[in-house]
Amino acid sequence: MCFWFAGSAFRYIFPFVFCDHVFELFLYTLRILRAFSRFILHFPHCFCIIQIRNPEYLIVYLALSTPQRKTKHSTYNNMKEGDFLMKYGHFDDVHQEYVITTPKTPLPWINYLGCNEFFSLISNTCGGYTFYKDAKLLRLTRYRYNNVPADINGKYLYIKDGDTVWNPGWQPTKTELDSYECRHGIGYSRFTSSKNGVKASVLSFVPLNDNCEISQLTLTNGSSEDKKLSVFSYVEWCLWNADDDMKNFQRNLSTGEVEVQDSTIYHKTEYRERRNHYAIYSVNTKIDGFDTSRDAFLGAYRGADSPEAVENGKCTNSMASGWSPIASHQINVDLAAGETKTFIFVLGYIENPEDEKWESYGVINKTRAKEMLAKYQTDAQVEEAFAALQAYWKQLLARYTVASADEKVNRMVNTWNQYQCMVTFNMSRSASYYESGIGRGMGFRDSCQD
């Protein structure tokens, strides 16, 4: 018989476990499978779906399917195994993507972006965090693991259309969308949603040769009338050491520093006294405002679900000094009926040699930042970088393929198991939504083992 685990909180899927005696399987494995949410048992003439609520309580669905009862119109005949396991989406084998069709998944479903030293975790609602090399010591953006509601803090884009404010990934405003789709691909994620005639598409990926994450926002006015929109970006900076960032408040609330030049926000906390690196968040167009103070952007007694600056339709041009620095751009967008406009946001990490830290007293050397940003100013440049990323993964996954009679085996072996293994190898399981990345870091044994 085939035993399929589908624990949505578990990072790994074990496709096949074989056992001769069902009751032995129950008695022996129930103790170690309590964390799994659901599994299906297949027998020669029936299958059994089991939902584990807690160790003492099981919900069991049994469907008999004997040869005598089967007909060509049988519901079971026309139903695939995946129909039970994919309530929230499906695999797209042609594009090697998993398509999530609702933002309201049981838990955040995340993808890993990055192949070399710069990594970003992104959920199906645009939550997540970003780091360079080490998720503890070089964390760019904050993430609160036990936050309520879950998965708040990420790389958010707010779209204000009159009195309606919404996000392409649904969170954090949770405004009901007219359509929603998230495609987690190999090294990238794409979000497509719409509200009141405006369609938004966001492509997020980490290019191969630069320490940055690209988010390409495409807005299309599908209505019959002109639209006046405002777009607000939002990331919250981590003060680099993610462990200390969550504890040492008496110091941390006094250290945040930023600079703003043109359309780029520079996060330079501790750059003056102890660091040779800073972070940037930029957009490839003239901005109509910005905020770098979280309190100024969100407002008193508010959260990311209802920022005061977005509600008012105007950023305050705040300059953070201590407290909680953020990066937010405001872009006012006029869209004629049928018109499309694209904006490219870049979140990046920059290092300077000790003798090249400053361009003048108290002003960071931005040369390397500007050189990197110059590579991602046009749609053609982004498309070229994205094509290079896809080509890299294509040649990597093509080194070993199988062609079996079972499409699920082909899908798992040719794409998702290999992708999972490479992500695990790159990060040594050091960072996820359940392994915070602030413990022992990249373990040597784990790296060798993976």
Feature roles, as predicted:
Residues 450:
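RNA-binding accessory domains that recognize and position tRNA/RNA substrates
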Residues 13, 28-29, 38-45, 49-79:
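Short, positively charged and aromatic/hydrophobic N-terminal segments
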Residues 56, 61, 68-447:
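Anionic coordination/interaction segments
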Residues 21-24:
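Alpha-helix boundary/capping motif
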